[in-house]
Design a protein with these regions (language model features):
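Non-globular, low-confidence helical/coil segments that flank catalytic cores
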Residues: 118-132, 152, 168, 266, ...
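Aromatic-rich juxtamembrane segments at the membrane interface
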Residues: 155-287, 292-293, 422, 596, ...
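Membrane-interface helix/helix-cap signal primarily in integral membrane proteins
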Residues: 54-223, 533, 537-541, 545-549, ...
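Residue-level signal for inorganic ion chemistry
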Residues: 13, 83, 326, 372, ...
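Alpha-helical transmembrane segments of polytopic membrane proteins
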Residues: 24-35, 329-330, 391-399, 452-456
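Hydrophobic alpha-helical transmembrane segments in multi-pass membrane proteins
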Residues: 5, 47-50, 162, 212-388, ...
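Hydrophobic alpha-helical segments
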Residues: 1-19, 294, 407-422, 426-433
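N-terminal leader/targeting segments
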Residues: 1-77, 161-164, 176, 283-284, ...
Length: 754
C-alpha cells in the first residue's frame, strides 16, 4: 500500500470531524472498529482502504472525546489541581495545563485559560502551581459570519476556562525559554519596534499594539507575525547551509548529503521549541519532519505527494487540528502554489538576475493572491486590496533581512559580544521601521465581502483551468455555464414578501436586526468594553457579510450593554437615523404614540409615556413591528413596574407573535400579565452563558413555557433567525439548525448559566 494512499485514508477518515453534528457513542465506535477489522481481512484493495479509513475515523473521534472529557467532567465542583503555566501576560491572563487532579496525574494534560486575577507572586511559563480551581467548559458566542471562538478553543486544546480560589507555587523556577524571553525583553526595551521583534522572533504577540495588528490585517501581512512555515523553514535552510559550508573542512569520507538535512531539521525543532511550540509551529515541525523522511527515503516525490503526506501526518498526530483555520489557510496556500507553478509556471525570460528575482516574486505573489481568495473570504470575510503590493515589500524584507537579523541577534544574545548584538538589534529594528513606513503609506485596503461573492472568488481557479485546457474553444458551453453558476448568487434578489428578524449572539447585551429588501434597522447595538465593542467586532462585519445596508437604529435605553456599539456603527454609516427615549441630540423620539412605516412594516412605540421621568430599564423603548399578519414586540430591559403601567392602559395593543424577553430573562421582568397579554408563540432571550446574574432565570423560563411559548435563548441557540413570509414564519438557530456541529454544543453542567 502506497504511503500517499495511507495519507488519503487518514485525511478522509478525520475530515468528518469538521462536519459531524455530534460525536458517536462508545458502542458505535466499538462496532466500527470491529467492522473495520473484518473488512481488513477481505483481499480487495478498495475494501481495505475503506477499513483503514474507518480506523482513522475512530481515532479522530477518540481524540475529540479526550479533549472534551475535561469540560464534561471537571465543571461544577471545585477541583484541587496542579497547573503548569505555559504562557502568561504577567498580569491577569494565564494559560496552563492541568497535570494532576486530586493528587493523581492525568494524561494527556487538559488545557486551561484563567482570566481576571493576579497570582500571589510573579508568574512565568514553566512554573507549577497548586490551585483550588473553579473551572468552566469553554463556551463562545456563535454568529453567522463571526469568529467561532468555541471551535478555536477546542482546536487549541483549551476546553476549560476558569479562575483559582487558592494558589501556591510548587516549582517557582521559570522554564529556560521563559528565562531567555525575559532576558530578551529587558535587552529590547530601548528599541521602538521591540514588540514586533519579539513577535517575529519568539512568537510573543500579546504585547503587539492593536494599531500594528490592524495595519498588518488591512495590508494582508498579518501572516508574517505567526511563527509558521516561513520562519521555521528559513531557520532550517539557514542551519543546513551553515552545516553544508562546514563540511568543506571535513575529510571526504565524512561528507554525507543527509547530515545538512538532518541538522537543519534539528535546528528548526530547537527554534520551534524556543518560540513556545505554538500550534502553527508544531504543525510546521511535523510537516518538516515528514518531508525530511520522504527526502531520506531516496525516492522521487511530487509536490502533491509531499502535500498529502504532510497534511496526513499533522492530522494523525493531532486530529482536532482539522478545526484549525490556520491549518486550512496554510494547507490551501501550499496547494495553491503547487497548482500555480504546475499550471502557470514563471516565464523563462532572458533577464538580469535582479530583474528575474523581481519577476519571480511578482509571479509568486500574484498566484497566492488570486488562488487564496476563496479561503480568505471564507475565513476572514474580506480581502485586502493592498495585499499584493504590501507583500511584495514585506515578504522579501522580513524573510531575507529582518528574520535573519533577529535570529542572528538571538544567537549572539547567548554568546556575545554585546556590541555585535546591539548592532544586529538596531538593524532589525530599523528594517521594521522601514517596513511599517511602507505599510502605513498604503491606503486603507481592507474591504468586507458579502457572502454572495464566495462562489465568484473561485473564478481565478476556473479561468486558469479554462485557459490551460483551451476549454473556451473546445467546450464553450461548459465555460459559459460555469461562469453563470459562479455569478448566480449575485443575481438573486430578496423575495419582496419576506422579511427577517435576527437576534445576534452578543453575550450579555442585546442586538437585533430587522431586515427587508437588503435594508436593515437595528434594535440596540450590543456591548462596549475597554478594547472594543459589539459594533466593531460583530455587527458591522455581520451586516457586510449578509449584504445588508442599515438605515436606522432604535435604542431601547442608555445602558452600555444596549448602546455599546453605536459609535462604531455611526462611524461607518453616519447618516443613520436614531430613535430613542433619551432626548439626546439628533435622536428622534421613541415614546408612546410614535408610529412610522418602513419597507412595508409598521413600527409603533408603546412605552415610555411622553414626558416620563423614569430612568434606566423602566425607561426602555418598547416597539412593536407588524406586517399585518405577524408581529414582534421588542421590550429592551423594561421591568415589572413599567410593564404593569403599560398594560393598565394599552394591553389590547401589545399582542404579538414573538416577544423579545425583557431584561435578559431577569426575575425583575416578564411578569405573568405581560406574558399572558402578549399571547405570543416564541420568547427570544439574549444573554451570555456565564454571567454574574445567572440570567435568564429558570423561573422566568418556566413561566413562559407554562403559557405555551417556545423558549429560545442565545446561550443555547446562538444567533437566531426568524423568517416571515406570506406562508407564515419559520425560526432557525445557528447551533441547532443552521450550523449544528459537535464543537458548538453546550459542554459541561447542562443547567449552569452563571
Amino acid at each position: 500500500m502506497k504511503i500517499t494512499t495511507v495519507g488519503v485514508c487518514i485525511i478522509s477518515g478525520i475530515f468528518p470531524l469538521l462536519i459531524l453534528p455530534q460525536l458517536p457513542g462508545t458502542l458505535t465506535l466499538a462496532f466500527l472498529t470491529l467492522f473495520a477489522c473484518v473488512l481488513a481481512f477481505i483481499p480487495v484493495k478498495t475494501v481495505r482502504y475503506i477499513a483503514l479509513t474507518l480506523l482513522f475515523f475512530v481515532w479522530g473521534i477518540l481524540s475529540a472525546k479526550q479533549i472534551l472529557w475535561a469540560g464534561e467532567t471537571l465543571t461544577g465542583a471545585t477541583q484541587d489541581a496542579i497547573v503548569e503555566i505555559t504562557a502568561t501576560d504577567g498580569m491577569t491572563t494565564h494559560y496552563g495545563q492541568i497535570t494532576h487532579l486530586q493528587g493523581r496525574r492525568i494524561f494527556p494534560a487538559s488545557g486551561l485559560v484563567m482570566y481576571g486575577e493576579y497570582l500571589p507572586q510573579a508568574v512565568c511559563a514553566g512554573q507549577q502551581w497548586s490551585m483550588k480551581l473553579k473551572v468552566r467548559a469553554v463556551h463562545g458566542q456563535l454568529n453567522d459570519g463571526g469568529f467561532d471562538s468555541q471551535r478555536y478553543a477546542i482546536a487549541q486544546h483549551q476546553p476549560l476556562t476558569g479562575r483559582f480560589l487558592q494558589a501556591s507555587v510548587i516549582e517557582p523556577n521559570c522554564s529556560l525559554r521563559a528565562q531567555y524571553l525575559a532576558s530578551l525583553q529587558t535587552t529590547l526595551q530601548p528599541y521602538p519596534w521591540n514588540a514586533v521583534i519579539l513577535g517575529l522572533g519568539m512568537g510573543e504577540r500579546l504585547s503587539v499594539p492593536k494599531e500594528i495588528k490592524n495595519i498588518m490585517r488591512d495590508t494582508g501581512t498579518a501572516h508574517l507575525m505567526a511563527i509558521s512555515g516561513l520562519h521555521i523553514a528559513f531557520a532550517a535552510l539557514l542551519a543546513a547551509g551553515l552545516i553544508r559550508s562546514g563540511q568543506i573542512f571535513l575529510p571526504g569520507r565524512w561528507i554525507h548529503w543527509q547530515i545538512p538535512l538532518i541538522g537543519g531539521i534539528c535546528c528548526a525543532a530547537f527554534y520551534a521549541w524556543l518560540t513556545g511550540m505554538q500550534p502553527p509551529a508544531l504543525r510546521t515541525m511535523v510537516a518538516l519532519a515528514t518531508w525530511g523522511m520522504l527526502k531520506l527515503s531516496g525516492r522521487q516525490w511530487s509536490g502533491w505527494d509531499v502535500w498529502i503526506c504532510c497534511l496526513a501526518a499533522i492530522l494523525l498526530m493531532d486530529p482536532v487540528a482539522i478545526l484549525s483555520q490556520s491549518l486550512w489557510l496554510s494547507a490551501a496556500a501550499v496547494a495553491a502554489l503547487i497548482f500555480w507553478y504546475q499550471w502557470f509556471p514563471c516565464p523563462e525570460w532572458q533577464l538580469p538576475p535582479v530583474l528575474r528575482a523581481v519577476v519571480s516574486l511578482i509571479h509568486l505573489q500574484l498566484g497566492i493572491t488570486l488562488l487564496l481568495m476563496p479561503v480568505q473570504i471564507v475565513i476572514f470575510h474580506g480581502i485586502s486590496l493592498t495585499s499584493f503590493i504590501a507583500n511584495l515589500l514585506a515578504i522579501p524584507l522580513v524573510t531575507f533581512i529582518t528574520v535573519p537579523l533577529i535570529l542572528a541577534a538571538m544567537v549572539v544574545h547567548l554568546s556575545g559580544p554585546l556590541i555585535l548584538e546591539q548592532g544586529l538589534w538596531f538593524l532589525a529594528d530599523r528594517s521594521l521601521a522601514l517596513l511599517f513606513w511602507g505599510l502605513k503609506s498604503l491606503p486603507e485596503g481592507w474591504i468586507n465581502i458579502a457572502e454572495r461573492w464566495q462562489w465568484l472568488s473561485f473564478s481565478p481557479w476556473f479561468l486558469l483551468v479554462v485557459w490551460r485546457l483551451n476549454a473556451w474553444r473546445t467546450l464553450p458551453a461548459m465555460c459559459v455555464a460555469g461562469g453563470l453558476l459562479m455569478c448566480w448568487p449575485l443575481w438573486q434578489k430578496p423575495r419582496p414578501d419576506e422579511w427577517q428578524l435576527y437576534m445576534l449572539d452578543v453575550g450579555q447585551g442585546l442586538a437585533m436586526v430587522i431586515a427587508r429588501n437588503g435594508k436593515a434597522i437595528l434594535y440596540d447595538t450590543g456591548l462596549a468594553w475597554p478594547e472594543g465593542d459589539s459594533g466593531q467586532q460583530l455587527i458591522i462585519p455581520w451586516l457586510h457579510w449578509h449584504n445588508l445596508e442599515p438605515e436606522g437604529v432604535i435604542l431601547s435605553h442608555e445602558h452600555l450593554d444596549h448602546r455599546g456599539g453605536l459609535d462604531s456603527i455611526l462611524h461607518i454609516w453616519p447618516m443613520l437615523w436614531i430613535r430613542s427615549p433619551l432626548n439626546w441630540e439628533h435622536h428622534q423620539p421613541c415614546v408612546r404614540g410614535e408610529a412610522w412605516q418602513w419597507q412595508g412594516l409598521r413600527f409603533s412605540a408603546h412605552w415610555p409615556l411622553q414626558g416620563s421621568n423614569d430612568k434606566g430599564n423602566n425607561h426602555s423603548c418598547v416597539v412593536k413591528v407588524d406586517d399585518g399578519t405577524n408581529s414582534i414586540l421588542l421590550t429592551g430591559d423594561i421591568e415589572a413596574p413599567a410593564e404593569q403601567k403599560m398594560l393598565s392602559r394599552y394591553w389590547q395593543q401589545v399582542q404579538a407573535t414573538l416577544l423579545q424577553v425583557p431584561h435578559h430573562g431577569s426575575n425583575t421582568s416578564s411578569s405573568l400579565p405581560l406574558i399572558q397579554r402578549v399571547n405570543g408563540k416564541v420568547a427570544l432571550a439574549s444573554a451570555s452563558r456565564y454571567n454574574a446574574w445567572r440570567l435568564p432565570s429558570n423561573k422566568v423560563k418556566h413561566r413562559y413555557q407554562l403559557q405555551g411559548y417556545q423558549w429560545i435563548d442565545t446561550p443555547h441557540q446562538g444567533q437566531t433567525t426568524v423568517n416571515f413570509s406570506a406562508q407564515g414564519w419559520r425560526i432557525s438557530s445557528l447551533r441547532e439548525q443552521i450550523l449544528p456541529r459537535w464543537y458548538h454544543q453546550w459542554f459541561g453542567v447542562p443547567v449552569d448559566n452563571g
